[in-house]
Each structure stands twice: as C-alpha cells, then as structure tokens.
Swiss-Prot record:
NADP(+) binds at K87, D110, N137, Y237, K241. It comes from Aspergillus sclerotiorum. Belongs to the short-chain dehydrogenases/reductases (SDR) family. Disulfide bonds: none annotated. Its EC number is 1.1.1.-. Short chain dehydrogenase; part of the gene cluster that mediates the biosynthesis of the tetrahydropyranyl antifungal agent restricticin that acts as an inhibitor of CYP51 and blocks the ergosterol biosynthesis. The highly reducing polyketide synthase resH, the short chain dehydrogenase resG, the cyclase resF, the FAD-dependent monooxygenase resA and the enoylreductase resD are required to generate the first stable intermediate desmethylrestrictinol. This is Short chain dehydrogenase resG.
Length: 359
C-alpha cells in the first residue's frame, strides 16, 4: 500500500510511532521543519585558525554546505573524507579559491568497507595528522537488499557500524593538546567529535533487548547480517541512527570517566532539501514545501561543531538545542541496549586489531 510513496513521506507514515504526538513523533517533526531549525548564532570572533578539521560525506548536501561554512572560519587544514575522490577534488579547488590561506586535503573513505576505514586512518596517522574537529556526517539511504563484503546491510554499515568504528580509530588523533588560538579570537576548547544522527531514531525501538543478566542468543550487530532480520529500509535506517545516538552517549560518558578532554556532540540537521533521498517529482515537492535549506542544515552542523560550554558534551542537539533522545533510548530497555552495544563494539574493535580502549 505504501510502496508508491516517496521518501521521506514513506518513512513518516510507516513509522510505528506515527500516532506519537509528542515532539518525538513523525508528525510533529514534519510540522517543525519549516518553523524551527534556525541555528543559534556562532560565537563572536570564532576562529578555527591553526586547527585541523575533518568532514566526512562532504561532496554534496548538508555535508558540503557544512564544509563550506567551516572553511569560512579559517582552519589550517580541512580534510574531506569522501567516497567520490574526483568530485571532491573539484570541491577542493572551489574551497581553496574562495577561502584565502585554506589548505584542503582529499582522502578516500568508503564506509561500505571496513578496510577503507582502516586505510583512511592509516593515511592520517602516516601524515602525522592531529585532529581538532571531526564532523562525521556521511550517511546513506536506499531501498537496497545488498550485503557488503564485510557481511552487513549497507544501510547499517554506513550509518552506524563503519561510523562507530571510524570514531574509535580516530580517538588517538583527537586526544592531544589543542594549538593556541590567535589573539582576539575564540576557539572551541579541546578536540571535538560530532556524530550526525537523525530524528528517525525516535521512530523505532529494538527487538528483544535482554536484561544485563540474561544471555543474548543473537548479538546486536548480527541482526544486520541476516536478510531475515533486517526489516525494511526505513527501519534499518532508523535503527542504525538509534544505535549511533546510543553509542555517542556511552562514548561521552566513558570519555568523561577516563578524564579524556574530547567533547562528543550528537546532532541532527532535520530534513533538508538535498539529494539524500532518491530523486523524483514527489520528493522535490515535499522538499519545496517542508524541507529546510542545506544552508540551515549546514549551519546546525557548524553550531554542533563549535558551540561552547561543558553542557554540550554528550548532548543531543535537535534544532540546535540540547534535548533528550527518544523515550525508548532514555528508558530502561534503551539503557540496556546502550550497554550491550558498547560491549559488542569494543569486542569488534579489538577483533580488528584495535588496542583495548581503556574506558
């Protein structure tokens, strides 16, 4: 019945949370898009001078716009982690032409491949890159029944697994002393990691979450390896974004406990008029009537990347304001899922040769 509907309308009307009329629900979300989302102003005299900034998924849409806006803040080096390197080279030329003294580096990063993630971080390490800001924006949506070479649904691997794995591999490059900032300017304190989730995380739950004392018959990650348990593309996307938000929350908690000065921010730009969803006349009409501009979405990313204050650490920003994750995520089952997920990701990381996280 709903197969003819374009995205994101299909995602909205097929959501189990359709009749949730709290701010978490899909209908209040749709109504908010045109009336909220104006980002708070950036800090006066904000400068990223002498800083190294990484943006993934920066060849189009909100990611590209965020890269452009961050470039205007004058970082020493802007790294674009992208799947399409040839397109990124054109963007590099444009950014360097429009922004004096900016150096842009293009590095290939395909989140459908864990090996590509390894190579990407190895390249950064080999070049002695120290990151001040990592904006992990890359995402993916398609009605796609493929399984990647790593054995996972592409929707899950790109939107959660590879992004979380990249996060863990980048931590040693972020946990370093930040450079001094120019006199008369303000620089965000300490290194920062921004994880881009989606309000769709609130439109799903996770099946069969056991209590901590119970044995789990199927690991969380394996749910996304079996076509019989994947669910629809809409649900895969929502669950991947739910897991990413929970991962970010647990990471921020553990970094604080370990006295690591890296700030973690979880954010969403909302629905923006980009090419994220498959193109079509109805999709374009929905974008025209309901979507935010990519400039708004990019500005929300920049705010998440630069907003000052200790309260920003571990925050989930919606419409540029700290708010709670979904009721499920904050409830007892969500907390169990968060704890289980961290354990699985820590084991996954070490199985791929990562050092014990010590957090």
């Amino acid at each position: 019945m709903t197969g003819f509907l374009p995205e994101p309308l299909r995602m909205l009307v097929t959501s189990p949370a359709l009749l949730d009329f709290t701010s978490d629900g899909p209908l209040p979300y749709a109504l908010r898009q045109k009336f909220t989302g104006k980002p708070p102003p950036v800090t006066s005299n904000l400068s990223l001078a002498s800083q190294t900034v990484l943006v993934t998924g920066a060849t189009s849409g909100v990611g590209l716009e965020a890269a452009r806006q961050l470039a205007q803040l004058g970082p020493r080096l802007l790294i674009l982690g992208v799947r399409n390197a040839s397109k990124a080279e054109q963007i590099k030329s444009e950014l360097e032409r429009d922004t004096p003294n900016l150096t842009v580096q293009v590095a290939e990063l395909d989140l459908e491949s864990l090996l590509s993630v390894d190579r990407f971080v190895d390249e950064l390490s080999a070049n002695s890159i120290r990151l001040d800001l990592a904006l992990l924006n890359a995402g993916f949506f398609a009605h796609d029944d493929r399984i990647t070479d790593d054995g996972y649904s592409p929707l899950f691997q790109v939107n959660f697994l590879s992004t979380a794995y990249l996060t863990l591999k980048l931590l040693p490059l972020l946990h370093t002393t930040a450079p001094p900032h120019p006199p008369g300017t303000t620089t965000p304190p300490g290194p920062r990691l921004v994880l881009v989730t989606s309000e769709a995380h609130a439109w799903t739950t996770f099946p069969d979450v056991p209590r901590p004392t119970e044995n789990r018959t199927q690991p969380i990650l394996s749910v996304f390896q079996d076509k019989n348990t994947l669910g629809s593309a809409d649900d895969q996307y929502a669950r991947a974004k739910l897991l990413l938000a929970l991962f970010g929350k647990e990471l921020s908690r553990r970094l604080t406990a370990a006295e690591n000065d890296t700030t973690v921010v979880i954010t969403t730009p909302g629905f923006c008029a980009s090419n994220f969803f498959p193109d079509g006349m109805m999709t374009r009409l929905i974008q025209l009537t309901s979507a935010r501009s990519v400039q708004q979405g990019g500005a929300l990313h920049v705010f998440a990347a630069t907003a000052p204050g200790p309260e920003i650490h571990g925050a989930y920003l919606r419409d540029g304001k700290p708010t709670g994750l979904s009721k499920f995520a904050q409830g007892p089952q969500g907390q169990i899922l968060q704890e289980r997920l961290w354990g699985e990701m820590e084991e996954f990381f070490m199985q791929r040769g990562g050092s014990p996280l010590g957090m």
